Amino acid sequence: MNHFLEHNKTKIDTLCKNHKVKSLYAFGSVLTPKFNENSDIDLIVDFKQQDILEYASNYFNLKFALQAIFNREIDLLEEKAVKNPSFLEHINSKKQLIYAD
């Protein structure tokens, strides 16, 4: 795991538990030597079953809390919302687990 993510692992775990996250993965530049102070962080999340209002609240609160922790833009994709099979295959081939419940 990237040291930038690992350094904040306890905070990430707490956020994921509080926002009913089933799994959270990183992908993209955060996992490569290209990651720098200007890079955003690409994450893909799968939430536990919940009603739509609770889901929306958990999604946005998680995204904003992660942005506050990392002090940078977070590109948070919802796993079920990725419809492009090629893009999903690319993500799945590169992603790294950050949290699982």
Language model features with spans:
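Catalytic core of pol beta-like nucleotidyltransferases
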Residues: 1-25, 31-37, 50-101
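Short hydrophobic/aromatic beta-strand micro-patches
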Residues: 44-46
